[in-house]
Amino acid sequence: MLRNRNEGMSTIPEFSQIQFEGFCRFIDWGLAEELHKFPKIEDTDQEIEFQLFVETYQLAEPLIKERDAVYESLTYSSELYVPAGLIWKPGKDMQEQTVFIGNIPLMSSLGIFIVNGIYRIVINQILQSPGIYYRSELDHNGIFIYTGTIISDWGGRSELEIDRKARIWARVSRKQKISILVSSSAMGSNLREILENVRYPEIFLSFLNERDKKKIGSRENAILEFYQQFACVGGDPVFSESLCRELQKKFFQQRCELGRIGRRNMNRRLNLDIPQNNTFLLPRDVLAAADHLIGMKFGMGTLDDMNHLKNKRIRSVADLLQDQFGLALVRLENVVRGTICGAIRHKLIPTPQNLVTSTPLTTTYESFFGLHPLSQVLDRTNPLTQIVHGRKSSYLGPGGLTGRTASFRIRDIHTSHYGRICPIDTSEGINVGLIGSLAIHARVGPWGSIKTPFYEISERSKRLQLVYLSPSVDEYHMVAAGNSLALNRGIQEEQAVPARYRQEFLTIAWEQIHLRSIFPFQYFSMGASLIPFIEHNDANRALMSSNMQRQAVPLSRSEKCIVGTGLERQAALDSGVSAISEREGKVIYTNTDKIILSGNGDTITIPLVMYQRSNKNTCMHQKTQVSRGKCIKKGQILANGAATVGGELALGKNVLVAYMPWEGYNFEDAVLISERLVYEDIYTSFHIRKYEIQTHVTSQGPERITKEIPHLETHLLRNLDRNGIVMLGSWVETGDILVGKLTPQTAKESSYAPEDRLLRAILGIQVSTSKETCLKLPIGGRGRVIDVRWIQKKGGSSYNPETIRVYISQKREMKVGDKVAGRHGNKGIISKILPRQDMPYLQDGTPVDMVFNPLGVPSRMNVGQIFECSLGLAGDFLGRHYRVAPFDERYEQEASRKLVFSELYEASKQTANPWVFEPEYPGKSRIFDGRTGDPFDQPVLIGKSYILKLIHQVDDKIHGRSSGHYALVTQQPLRGRAKQGGQRVGEMEVWALEGFGVAHILQEMLTYKSDHIRSRQEVLGTTIVGGTIANPGDAPESFRLLVRELRSLALELNHFLLSEKDFQIHRKEA
């Protein structure tokens, strides 16, 4: 009954394991399965036959390493070679050659792909599993209508429904339905076979009338009737082979191919024994489905829950890559067939290598990784983000749902998600509940089901046995909830425990329990598992926290958290950002870019990542942790990566915080910080921006990279070398030239500027015919040039241009407007940076680093931050780090509070500071105003919290428009910083301005600064010359647009302008 047994306690599986297993499944048998489907190809005269011998295909080792593929913007892939034969039938001669099919992208050691130098990941998709599902719904008369929905492997749906008169219909389209007798006859069964293979033949005979008897009298009549209803054609169609082919292609192939998983599900649900290799819908399936539908009508059998995970399947990277490989082979088949026919027509002798080209496979995979919604650019903001992105599961994508049509029931948490899909970690917004994250112990089975581990409780064996169960199995067992299990087994056996059974929650005796959870974190994803005291937080805030941890910026000097959950080490290890020794040895050389080990008579060089840019512009860098002469063991950390310290994840800093209002500067989630965080580089981070330019071959000639740029100030060109490219280590400011480039153009005499013609006439100087198209540093890009790459592709044509990339590093301190957050959904914007002498200070004189608003806690119900804050203070004084598993109340009542207070009490005793733990108000302390030295009226909660700096920084957001583009239709300024857009003045902003009575500002915003074309053109001249800006004489463009749209609906809107002088009405045409 319970399979896949492993004895003993399990470790947490590697977080990229699901990706690795999926890719290995594709390489091991997905490739071979698709290659075996490749047909033998003959020419039109059937004299030449081409075939692939797929038993001995080969995948070559990659020609480049992963690091080089990223640096040179190449794809990390392997070449696929397959033996192919060309047989001449008249003489039975055969020519065999090994042909190159194409490149298959390989998964890297981190479970990701490198395509054109960009890290990409393929996320898992959750689809409705193919098979049959029964459900009921009320019609307009209040009567239950029972339907059975058959879902194909391609996602196509067919329905069987039974009406009030117990007649069974097959619905072929939304509006058309046909008798099940006709559809079964069209599939190849006669009336006698139908009646012999059903459980209730009398019901089938009851709705058989004379008209239906004629239709099912012959298969041709049944097919004609089926086609007429399916295609909605009138008249009397004539039976033909082309009609059969059209029906086969449009209906049966799309809606009747079940696949391996669908055949397995269909056999289980309908108690059939059809072989697994028979993957198409058979008449026997349809009749068995009709029998079950009749049983449902009369109260026999159970309806299906479509949202249960046993009725879902995971479409992993293996399935997606296999589908694309099959598509590429179909394209290759067409290419080979066309090439054979062309060679015969021109009387050429083909060879297997001449017939096969690598283009179909290469282009198919390039378009898949570039365009498919489930192939995404890897989010590399910090190490945690990389892990979580690979463990996402999505209901969206081809064959899935859309954000606008998905119902609340699909988005909601289901009991079958327990231990499989995290109930907390999902995206916010329109995709809430549709994009989730797999729980940390979840794994994907070979049939696409998500499995989770349990301990099986057996009377015969005293040892606990670990079993991985799919959702369809554990539903029928009593599963004890893991958050209520006591440590003492003897006490545990005497008590009643809460348990799950068939989607119900019960309280039963311990002897009746079949299974129990193995781990407190079992239900959560990686992001949620890093939140300490998560059980004390509202789920909405825990969701925000798990999302915001992925947005944390790696800091220049990271720090381990005082209060954690214990998974920080594994998160850092599985992210691959740290350099880890793969063997024992001795360090003989260390530098910033490499470490050299010696052992067993040879040396090994370990290259380190130096100032690598992530796709979110954060800095990925490795710092050496070992010194020369030190002996190293296998698995020891040699260098810390970004946001890791000592092999643990370190996303933020432990800072001293106080929860109190301060002059309104922390109103509505604003945060007050000390200047110490700025001057001591506590929250300083490095960001690397990439700027690139390409050189093309134009119709007038090639573009040139040069330092000699006419008509530009020498100051702007000061950082260029003799080739016209910015020098490494240069400090560049906004507007500086990074790459000098000239584009040739044809210049007519009339197009020259007057000064150009003067120079030519007097001095005889030949005016340049090239246009300056240099790469300039945009606004906000100032920094240090750390790398320049000149990528020259083979055969530099206009289709294959050269690319020059310049990487500039920026050092960013904390500023007003930056976003910070804790690990409990407590986020805020920095409102003011106070001098440290003005900050509130503790009784030992220590100034506070951050001041949070206490009103942010009660309404949000994220009390976990209070526990973390106080325990962090105790840990700071005692020099301890705490790793607290969630749901510690399963050991005793109020366990979290007791732990915090006992540690605070010990810290108070050891440091001889009674104010650390005061029994009257435990956790709080009297603190003083830094400006006056007076104590505040009330005791204030103080402590050490782990605060993150998020990627939402004011330098990337702040923007002002001086002039820019306008929308073509409305003639209003565009929106967004990237388009140099304007600020939107919405309805509520207009109300505020109206409330102040600022008529002129309102008029400017509605006319000159927005969409009054003539008036805004006059503003410039009036501003230069001086004088009064004239009032706009007619309606703005948006009003004219409204009038035109009403006219298109045959509604005439007249508008009039009232003269200020004589109050006469003047009609104006819109």
From Swiss-Prot:
| Spans traversing the lipid bilayer | none
Q: Which reaction does it catalyse?
A: RNA(n) + a ribonucleoside 5'-triphosphate = RNA(n+1) + diphosphate
**Pfam family name, one:** RNA_pol_Rpb2_6
Q: What does this protein do?
A: DNA-dependent RNA polymerase catalyzes the transcription of DNA into RNA using the four ribonucleoside triphosphates as substrates.
Which molecular function terms from Gene Ontology are attached? DNA binding; DNA-directed RNA polymerase activity; ribonucleoside binding
> Subunit comment for this entry?
In plastids the minimal PEP RNA polymerase catalytic core is composed of four subunits: alpha, beta, beta', and beta''. When a (nuclear-encoded) sigma factor is associated with the core the holoenzyme is formed, which can initiate transcription.
> What is one cellular component GO term in this UniProt entry?
mitochondrion
Q: What is this protein called?
A: DNA-directed RNA polymerase subunit beta
Record EC number = 2.7.7.6
Q: Which family does it belong to?
A: Belongs to the RNA polymerase beta chain family.
Principal localisation:
plastid
Keywords, alphabetical: Chloroplast, DNA-directed RNA polymerase, Nucleotidyltransferase, Plastid, Transcription, Transferase
Give the top-rank taxon of the lineage listed in the UniProt record for this protein: Eukaryota
Task: Tell me the Gene Ontology biological-process terms attached to this UniProt entry.
Answer: DNA-templated transcription
Q: Where does this protein reside within or beyond the cell?
A: Plastid, Chloroplast
Specify the species: Piper cenocladum
SUPFAM superfamilies tied to this protein: beta and beta-prime subunits of DNA dependent RNA-polymerase
